[in-house]
């Protein structure tokens, strides 16, 4: 899912993770602390004991947590903050996004785990990163506001 900064991607994704009653979920945040996420969850009034919050950006640690907890649903917030030690480039680079997304895709396919990836957008409104990112996922959602910023459009 992509969208402008502040449009509500993280909040909507957290709502999805928390509302998945009966499903074990792992919410991985590369942008906020666990405390910040818990405060947002309290504000939106949804609780789920089966939702684990994991603030992390190193892909290898994220995959280890996924393997350890075996969640039904994983939320990655956001793909541009995740990096692997296998590459010398910085998080958010085309090569990092490609490698991290490919690793997550491989894990999802081998285990049946659903992975929801949040991505930033460029100034022209397209998903930031390699175009291949849009081709390896099952669905691309664009989250936008209306002209008055009253409503959100998915």
How should each PLM-predicted stretch be described?
Residues 105-154:
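Phosphate-binding/switch region of NTP-binding enzymes
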Residues 1, 26-28, 116, 141:
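Hydrophobic/aromatic beta-strand patches that form the interior of the parallel beta-sheet core
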Residues 4-7, 11-103:
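Conserved inter-motif catalytic segment of the P-loop NTP-binding fold
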């Amino acid at each position: 899912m992509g969208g402008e900064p502040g449009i509500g991607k993280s909040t909507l994704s957290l709502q999805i993770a928390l509302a998945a009653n009966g499903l074990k979920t792992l919410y991985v945040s590369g942008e906020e602390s666990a405390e910040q996420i818990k405060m947002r969850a309290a504000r939106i009034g949804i609780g789920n004991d089966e939702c684990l919050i994991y603030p992390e950006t190193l892909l290898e640690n994220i995959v280890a947590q996924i393997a350890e907890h075996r969640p039904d649903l994983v939320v990655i917030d956001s793909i541009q903050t995740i990096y692997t030690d296998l590459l010398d480039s910085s998080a958010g680079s085309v090569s990092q996004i490609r490698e991290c997304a490919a690793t997550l895709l491989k894990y999802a396919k081998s285990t049946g785990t659903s992975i929801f990836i949040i991505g930033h957008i460029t100034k022209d409104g397209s998903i930031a990163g390699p175009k291949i990112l849009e081709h390896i996922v099952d669905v691309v959602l664009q989250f936008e506001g209306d002209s008055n910023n009253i409503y959100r459009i998915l």
